[in-house]
Regions:
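Glycine-aromatic micro-motifs
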Residues: 1-161
Length: 161
């Protein structure tokens, strides 16, 4: 088993099941906090035709997400989903706090070739990320912050078009 911190579409157990072919809700430990990073849409996914989430170092910020305790058999399918083999994302091992406990050597994924500016998410990706955040019980204030960030990026994109 390995610990995995999800902060984007993988927060949604339903969407994760779509690619891992297994119900993952049973592996949810709870919502967790990753300190020293912030969220950003610094990758364009051709498959999703959307800006997709990344975490970038930022000493003054934190990211809330979902901590999973997954069986090893899901490691390779998760890497495939995150495009590791083609250089989309890479593993990063981090420390997160969940239910008052510190978890070390937790796998998360970070974008390899980051865009210089954030790219807005599609409506579909927007909804999957929010559904995961709400389903897994992330704090309401964080869900609203996530909603507002994604919505502002979409508004900026519409104005630029």
């Amino acid at each position: 088993m390995f610990y995995y911190f999800a902060y984007g579409s993988c927060m949604c157990p339903v969407d994760l099941k779509r690619t891992l072919k297994e119900n993952t809700h049973q592996y949810v430990v709870g919502h967790a906090i990753l300190s020293g990073y912030r969220l950003g849409f610094y990758r364009y996914s051709k498959m999703r035709r959307s800006g997709v989430l990344d975490v970038v170092p930022d000493d003054k910020s934190s990211v809330t997400g979902v901590l999973y305790h997954l069986p090893w058999r899901l490691s390779q399918p998760l890497d495939i989903r995150e495009d590791v083999h083609r250089g989309g994302y890479r593993h990063e091992y981090v420390e997160v706090k969940c239910h008052g406990k510190i978890y070390r050597n937790v796998r998360t994924y970070v974008v390899v070739d980051k865009l210089k500016q954030e790219m807005a998410p599609s409506d579909w990706y927007f909804n999957v990320v929010l559904r995961g955040a709400v389903t897994c019980g992330l704090p309401e204030e964080y869900c609203w912050s996530l909603f507002n960030h994604m919505h502002q990026l979409q508004l900026q994109q519409q104005k630029a078009a």
